[in-house]
């Protein structure tokens, strides 16, 4: 390996931040699985209404966001440059997923103002993970 392609030594906190990123994306995967396998009989009327109003493309974007995001964070821990691309796709999918709350009237009508807090936090955390990967690549920490 020459000096241009050899990864540089990483900051001591890199591994902790990468593992925290994996945990965040893994929680997203668990949330996705819980929602797509939910027993409709156990849900409240409001929860069923939200599921019924959600378009198929929202669920597809949700799946892409969490599973590609998990792959991206694993690549980040392994210090692979591919992490940036995967996490960029994940971020785009999160934006598509949560745009449904603005674009689909039934979803918007069913959501309370408090219901928008979680999507905003998820977008911010996903952006932070993407930025972490991008910044790590710029610093030469990824190969």
Where are these regions (language model features)?
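Topology signature of small-to-medium multi-pass alpha-helical membrane proteins
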Residues: 1-143
